[in-house]
């Protein structure tokens, strides 16, 4: 039944052959020969098959059991009844026969009696009649009468032949004959009787047949049971086996009978089954249970066990009947199904979860994209505003106007910074941030950053730069990004520090453990390969301050976007909360780590460690040599090995217009003069502080030194005072005047003072620019198809003091480049005839190959006569700046991929143009 | 006389501000104005004139292209609108620029109805702007003629 149900359930699955419950290859040889699991032939041949009984039973106790159990006894009673019934039937038949015979005999005897009577009458014997008795008299009379009547009827016959002998003879003969016949009949009856008796004997045959039938039925039963995958058994009250069917083959009779499960088997499930049986025995209710056995004997098998209590005639429990069916496969399948269903559910749940996540991610991406686009859209006009303000600041303004303008510029810068932050962040997050590997000097960078910070410093803070001696002069890395990080951290430090020091400390450290762990192998290989030319160095950079510090509980969320240590801080100090997030992301992008340690009201230290590639150490020593005899060197060597810079607060710091020299983000037009003893571009510093601080770093006007752009114009090496002579004396008195005025004034005063300064420095700048122009006027080519854009750009260029040539499309650009040499190309991306990207590719191809073959192939008409001219030209890389309406990551990627150096987003503003020219025109 | 100049100046300032506030112009126009100096006193007017000529030409181009019912060269329209977008962005014609962006989108999706509708709007918008700027330049001229200085307008 169970088996059937199971097969129904697994119908869709492959119906497999049910294997034998017990393994085939166990059991003793002796057991085996009786083990006729599957007799050959079909059921019809059952009679011929000798079915050995596999039953092991205690023969002495079985009858007892049978007698004492209900089933046994009732079965036996049935048999007996049936047998009795058959016997009765036979007996009844025989009795009837006997009755018949008896009757026949009685008849015969009656006849005989009659004959004898008749004979008596013939002999005429006197009858003894009691005389005295009246009744007898009466009886006699009656008899008389009767006899009379009888005699009377025969009297005549007798009378007739009475006299003759012949008659008597005849009479005797006939009597004799009758006797004979009678005897004969008797004999025949006797014969019949004996025959009857014989048949009686043969009546025992049905019993035998019955026995045979019984045997056959039993055989059939055995056959069925033998093939059935079940174990059956009977156990007594103590759960000792009295009987078992289909036992495990290797167990012998004596191993099982009289023993309990626990005694026979060992392992899991045995105890359970034993308990279950006992429970059934106690409760007296048949029940089923699935039990998994794990025994040494047959491993792990699951059995469906049915146990029922057995009662004797008196209604007392005497044991249990036990039936077990192996359902291991079914259980396994069922479990598999359950597992599958569970897996399915889990997968579905995960899928929906995933969908949700995807949805959220998409939403986030869209939001980010939106933010980036929006930021960009805001940035373009804003930079216009700021740029215009800057241009405005170069014109003649009264004090009030200038003050307003400065506020406008600084707030504009702030917003620009914020938008740049957002764009940077989305760039890093979307993975399109490209890192560049350029050689740079860490000392210069630190100095420059501090210098810039000092320029916008409005507090009495000392800025310090400290670079360990073992830091290489030159390393390779993405200097722009590193500068960005430093600037960010420094401006943070300054923001949260009211007095004391802020500084940067650089030192070489051994490879940090977080890298060593996961990149040990790769790195060593690299070292081996590049050992001669290039090695990696890890530089640890601390940006420390003596500021308000950060409470410990705020540290974890410090690097999260839009998070600041507390809302109070955000209100008090402003800021977007993006700076640190960007720093962290950038540092991680470059394979480093940014950490922070801080104590409240003692200060914070932000530390980032980054790997850099280093050139050969030869370079270093070369630089050293160069440095050693620097007497009449340019200003550069000063930076190369200088390990310590300090920017002390000069009471009433002087702001000056530094001109276009600084390419940094923050208020690039301002530079603070802080070096105590130096004259910079003729500005005099506090002469009282004139102790020889040769270690001190001096601030030059607007970082010209770094850019080394206008060396020729002023050539101000701070070490040699004679260079200040360069016609700056005229400012002397004015500057000292403003110094003193600013000393006495607050911030507002500083603004006022600036106007004068600006005028002078502006004049100076113009002068410098004319000088530059005279020496080498840069040639700029604008490739743009939109007349209005051309007009605007041209006008801006004019403002910046440049003129430029115009090409209306890529082909014209190529022709122009072919015929004349340019220092910079501003290239629109989207143009008719030949777009900016393709044109750039062709120009780059020309630079590489020295011919315009690629362009000619592309269908650009280049006159051959000019080719010769071309070949003479130096094949320096021509800076090509893209002008694009869309600065989103992909577009800029495309620009870079096509060989462009940078890009300006449209609409072009004065500020953008100026930055670009600063970067690419030397 | 001074009162007239002051009046004109105030009028000019208000009018300029209204143009910004109503979204006709954006900061790029301010940028243009900064580029105007002694060397090129009519710079803005020149650029703007060029722009309106450009507008006229491009719009008629697009109108012609969109007139070819059933056989509209959306690529042609697209390149024209790209040009117009660049120009309007450069002069700070904010509304025209915004419409150009929408028109470009319609064009990219080949939405004929949208294109036609947008183009009509662009036409209206640029003409309005032209009229307004004309007014503004007239005011400027009046100020100059009255001997006044064109005031700086902070937006």
Curated annotation (Swiss-Prot), chain A:
Its EC number is 2.7.13.3. Residues 738-747 have a biased composition (Low complexity). SUPFAM superfamilies: ATPase domain of HSP90 chaperone/DNA topoisomerase II/histidine kinase, CheY-like, Homodimeric domain of signal transducing histidine kinase, PYP-like sensor domain (PAS domain). Residues 761-773 have a biased composition (Basic and acidic residues). Signal peptide: none annotated. Mg(2+) binds at residues 785, 828, 830. It holds the Pfam family HisKA. Induction: By H(2)O(2). PROSITE patterns: HIS_KIN (PS50109), RESPONSE_REGULATORY (PS50110). GO terms for molecular function: metal ion binding; phosphorelay sensor kinase activity; protein histidine kinase activity. Gene3D superfamilies: 1.10.287.130, 3.40.50.2300, Histidine kinase-like ATPase, C-terminal domain (3.30.565.10), PAS domain (3.30.450.20). One of its GO terms (cellular component) is cytoplasm. Interacts with AHP1, APH2, APH3, APH5 and APH6, but not with APH4. This is Histidine kinase 5. It comes from Arabidopsis thaliana (Mouse-ear cress). The lineage of its organism: Eukaryota, Viridiplantae, Streptophyta, Embryophyta, Tracheophyta. The gene is AHK5.
């Amino acid at each position: 039944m169970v088996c059937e149900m199971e097969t129904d359930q697994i119908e869709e699955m492959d119906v497999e052959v049910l294997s034998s419950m017990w393994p085939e290859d166990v059991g003793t040889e002796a057991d085996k020969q009786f083990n006729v699991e599957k007799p050959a032939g079909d059921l019809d041949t059952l009679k011929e098959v000798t079915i050995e009984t596999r039953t092991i039973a205690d023969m002495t106790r079985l009858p007892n059991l049978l007698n004492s159990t209900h089933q046994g006894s009732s079965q036996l009673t049935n048999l007996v009844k049936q047998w009795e019934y058959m016997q009765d039937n036979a007996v009844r038949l025989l009795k009837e026969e006997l009755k018949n015979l008896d009757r026949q005999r009685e008849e015969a005897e009656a006849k005989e009696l009659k004959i004898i009577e008749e004979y008596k009458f013939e002999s005429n014997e006197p009858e003894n009649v009691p005389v005295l008795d009246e009744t007898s008299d009466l009886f006699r009379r009656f008899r008389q009468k009767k006899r009379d009547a009888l005699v009377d009827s025969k009297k005549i016959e007798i009378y007739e032949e009475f006299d003759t002998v012949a008659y008597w003879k005849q009479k005797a003969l006939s009597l004799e004959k009758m006797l004979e016949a009678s005897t004969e009949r008797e004999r025949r009856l006797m014969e019949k009787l004996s025959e009857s008796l014989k048949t009686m004997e043969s009546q025992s045959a049905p019993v035998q047949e019955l026995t045979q039938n019984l045997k056959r039925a039993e055989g059939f039963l055995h056959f069925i049971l033998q093939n059935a995958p079940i174990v059956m058994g009977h156990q007594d009250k103590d759960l000792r086996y009295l009987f078992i069917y289909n036992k495990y083959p290797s167990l012998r009779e004596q191993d099982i009978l009289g023993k309990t499960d626990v005694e026979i088997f060992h392992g899991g499930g045995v105890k359970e089954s034993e308990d279950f049986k006992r429970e059934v025995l106690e409760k007296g209710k048949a029940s089923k249970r699935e039990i998994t056995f794990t025994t040494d004997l047959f491993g792990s098998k699951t059995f469906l066990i049915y146990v029922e209590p057995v009662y004797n005639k008196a209604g007392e429990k005497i044991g249990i009947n036990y039936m077990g069916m192996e359902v291991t496969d079914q259980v396994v399948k069922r479990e598999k199904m359950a597992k599958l269903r569970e897996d399915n559910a889990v997968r579905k749940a995960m899928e929906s979860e995933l969908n949700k996540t995807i949805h959220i991610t998409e939403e986030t991406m869209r939001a980010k994209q939106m933010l980036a686009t929006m930021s960009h859209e805001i940035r373009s006009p804003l930079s216009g505003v700021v740029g215009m303000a800057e241009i405005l600041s170069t014109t003649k303004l009264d004090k009030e106007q200038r003050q307003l303008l400065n506020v406008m510029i600084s707030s504009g810068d702030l917003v620009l910074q914020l938008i740049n932050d957002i764009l940077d962040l989305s760039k890093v997050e979307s993975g399109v941030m490209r890192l560049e590997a350029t050689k740079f000097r860490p000392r210069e960078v630190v100095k420059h950053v501090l210098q810039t910070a000092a320029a916008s410093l409005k507090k009495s803070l000392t800025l310090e730069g400290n670079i360990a001696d073992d830091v290489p002069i030159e390393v390779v890395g993405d200097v722009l990004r590193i500068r960005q990080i430093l600037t960010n951290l420094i401006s943070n430090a300054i923001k949260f520090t009211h007095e004391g020091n802020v500084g940067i400390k650089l030192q070489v450290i051994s490879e940090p453990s977080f890298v060593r762990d996961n990149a040990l192998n790769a790195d060593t290989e690299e070292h081996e390969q590049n050992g001669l030319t290039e090695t990696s160095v890890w530089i640890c950079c601390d940006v420390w301050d003596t500021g308000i510090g950060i409470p410990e509980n705020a540290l974890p969320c410090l690097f999260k976007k839009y998070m600041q240590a507390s809302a109070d801080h955000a209100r008090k100090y402003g800021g977007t909360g993006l700076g640190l997030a960007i720093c962290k992301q950038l540092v991680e992008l470059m394979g480093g780590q940014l950490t922070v340690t801080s104590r409240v009201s003692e200060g914070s230290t932000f530390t980032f460690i980054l790997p850099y590639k280093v050139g050969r150490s030869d370079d270093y020593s070369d630089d050293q040599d160069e440095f050693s005899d620097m007497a009449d060197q340019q200003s550069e060597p000063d930076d190369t090995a200088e390990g310590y810079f300090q920017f002390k607060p000069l009471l009433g710091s002087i702001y000056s217009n530094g001109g276009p020299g600084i390419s940094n983000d923050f208020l690039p037009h301002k530079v603070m003069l802080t070096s105590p003893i130096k004259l910079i571009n003729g500005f005099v510093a506090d002469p009282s502080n004139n102790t020889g601080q040769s270690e001190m770093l001096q601030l030059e006007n607007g970082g010209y030194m770094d850019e080394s752009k206008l060396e020729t114009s002023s050539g101000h090496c701070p070490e040699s005072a004679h260079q200040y002579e360069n016609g700056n004396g005229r400012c002397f008195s004015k500057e000292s005047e403003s110094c003193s005025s600013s000393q006495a004034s607050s911030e507002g005063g500083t603004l006022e003072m600036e106007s004068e300064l600006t005028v002078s420095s502006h004049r100076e700048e113009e002068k410098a620019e004319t000088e530059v122009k005279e020496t080498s006027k840069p040639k700029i080519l604008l490739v743009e198809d939109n007349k209005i854009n051309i007009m605007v750009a041209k006008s801006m260029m004019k403002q910046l003091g440049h003129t430029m040539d115009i090409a209306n499309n890529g082909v014209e650009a190529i022709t122009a480049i072919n015929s004349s040499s340019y220092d910079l190309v501003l290239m629109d991306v989207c143009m008719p005839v030949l777009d900016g990207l393709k044109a750039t590719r062709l120009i780059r191809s020309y630079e590489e190959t020295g011919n315009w073959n690629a362009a000619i192939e592309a269908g650009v008409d280049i006159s051959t006569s000019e080719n010769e001219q071309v070949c003479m030209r130096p094949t320096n890389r021509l800076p090509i700046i893209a002008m694009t309406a869309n600065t989103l990551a992909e577009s800029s990627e495309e620009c870079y991929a096509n060989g462009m150096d940078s890009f300006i987003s449209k609409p072009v503003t004065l500020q953008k143009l100026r930055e670009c020219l600063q970067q690419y025109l030397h | 006389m001074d009162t007239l100049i002051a009046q004109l100046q105030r009028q000019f300032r208000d009018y300029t501000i209204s143009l910004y506030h109503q979204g006709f112009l954006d900061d790029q126009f301010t940028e243009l104005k900064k580029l105007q100096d002694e060397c090129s006193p009519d710079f803005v007017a020149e650029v703007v004139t060029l722009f309106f000529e450009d507008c006229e030409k491009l719009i008629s181009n697009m109108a012609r292209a969109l007139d070819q019912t059933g056989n509209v060269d959306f690529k042609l329209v697209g390149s024209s609108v790209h040009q117009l977008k660049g120009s309007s962005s450069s002069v700070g014609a904010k509304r025209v620029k915004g419409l150009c962006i929408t028109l470009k989108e319609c064009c990219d999706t080949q939405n004929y109805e949208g294109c036609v509708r947008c183009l009509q709007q662009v036409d209206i918008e640029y003409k309005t702007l032209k009229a307004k700027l004309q007014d503004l330049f007239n005011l400027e001229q009046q100020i100059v003629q009255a001997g006044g200085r064109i005031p700086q307008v902070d937006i």
